[in-house]
């Protein structure tokens, strides 16, 4: 029986929105279930550096550096040929022909955003590129603090872009501590982070299948 790869692109034009944080945590969650590869197409290589610091005995997704369109194209083709179940693409924060091509390959595009004025002001260009790809897509709220005024206002603002909010990662110390240590925030004993990451992974797959 053949296995169809689920290709999830994590994309935003704005740096600092938590794009790699979302990509790494989705890849970790799916790696617990099935073969998973994280294609690191961001020139900063944050996901690649994260894997280098990861404990050798920890269950991990395969992380493949993809410097440029041809490398990403080869890696994605190979992942599909080898029937890797989950393929997460961490895309660079800019617009280019490479981005358009990779977005078009996605089964689902997730757009991380923080509930801040700076993020929301710059999100239109990201959304325009996502809509142009004609792929399923939605927002992930990152570093979310529900008690803040901005958090209460973000729902109506994002609704104007005709994309659903798929899920949330909270503003937790565990996430900022985990990545520099080669870990996920949910691997540091934070039970709320554990629940949050697995819930997000399930919601992303539901969106992939049902949107």
Task: Please state what every model-predicted region is.
Residues 2-17, 24-100, 179-187:
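P-loop/Walker-type NTP enzyme "switch/lid" segment
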Residues 80, 95-117:
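Inter-motif core of Ras-like GTPase G domains
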Residues 145, 155-183:
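Beta-strand-loop-alpha "switch" segments that mediate conformational coupling across diverse proteins
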Residues 175-198:
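Inter-lobe coupling/hinge region of RecA-like P-loop helicase motors
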């Amino acid at each position: 029986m053949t296995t169809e790869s689920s290709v999830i692109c994590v994309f935003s034009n704005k740096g600092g929105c938590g794009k790699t944080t979302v990509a790494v945590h989705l890849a970790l969650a799916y790696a617990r279930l099935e073969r998973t590869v994280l294609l690191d197409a961001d020139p900063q290589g944050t996901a690649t550096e994260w894997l280098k610091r990861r404990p050798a005995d920890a269950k991990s997704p395969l992380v493949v550096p993809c410097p440029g369109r041809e490398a990403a194209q080869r890696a994605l083709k190979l992942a599909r040929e080898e029937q890797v179940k989950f393929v997460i693409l961490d895309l660079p924060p800019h617009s280019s022909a490479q981005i358009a091509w990779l977005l078009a390959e996605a089964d689902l595009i997730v757009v991380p955003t923080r509930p801040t004025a700076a993020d929301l002001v710059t999100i239109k260009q990201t959304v325009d590129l996502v809509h142009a790809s004609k792929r399923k897509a939605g927002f992930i709220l990152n570093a979310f603090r529900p008690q803040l005024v901005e958090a209460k206002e973000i729902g109506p603002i994002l609704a104007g872009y005709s994309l659903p909010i798929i899920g949330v990662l909270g503003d937790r110390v565990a996430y900022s501590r985990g990545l520099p240590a080669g870990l996920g925030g949910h691997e540091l004993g934070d039970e709320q982070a554990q629940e949050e990451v697995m819930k997000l992974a399930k919601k992303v797959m539901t969106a992939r299948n049902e949107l």
